[in-house]
Amino acid sequence: MRIKSHFLFIFPLILLLLASCDPSSTPKEKYYSSTKTTNLELENVKSVSIGSSKYDVASCLRKKPKFIEVTEQPPYTTYIYGKSTEKYDVEFKIVANQVSRYDLISSKYSTEKGIHTGDSKKDVIRAYGENYYEREDTGATIIGYFDKNHKLNIEFSLDDKDKVEGILVQKINN
């Protein structure tokens, strides 16, 4: 009887734990130690890089963001440039008045090495080199690079034809 009551208590907890895990999604941190470093120090969008001040964003892009979203917990602000919050060109995450991340989902902007949305996986590897990791996240293939010296990460989201759909550059917090 005692085993049965333990089983009835523990079994639902195990099911809940398994249900909350997405087997198709592997966190990028898993690849950090096994991926060689790539220099990403010069990555920027119109001279705005990770660590730039929030004031540099509007100044360098020569316009104010079209949309601003404020999140209270954890505190950060998102500056969005584009037609809408869903169909944007570039989005900057501002934490403590500094850029901590930016996303590109249109070909209007490119990486420092000239990669735009629509470019191929081969173009990315030609520009950034062979020291990348590859993972799946919510059905998309992601290839990424770490700059361990400057604590930066860049990821390229690929569609089913291995074309770049989106680009994420962010500060590494480890």
Where are these regions (language model features)?
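Bacterial N-terminal signal peptides that target proteins for export
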Residues: M1-L8
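Sec-dependent N-terminal signal peptides
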Residues: L8-I14
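C-terminal motif of bacterial Sec signal peptides marking the signal peptidase cleavage site
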Residues: L17-S20
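Bacterial signal peptide processing site
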Residues: D22-S24
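A cross-family detector of function-defining hotspots
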Residues: P27-E29, S34, K46, S53-V95, ...
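Acidic/histidine-rich, surface-exposed loop or edge segments in extracytoplasmic proteins
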Residues: T35-E43, S100-Y109
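Glycine-rich loop/hinge motif
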Residues: V48, E112-K113
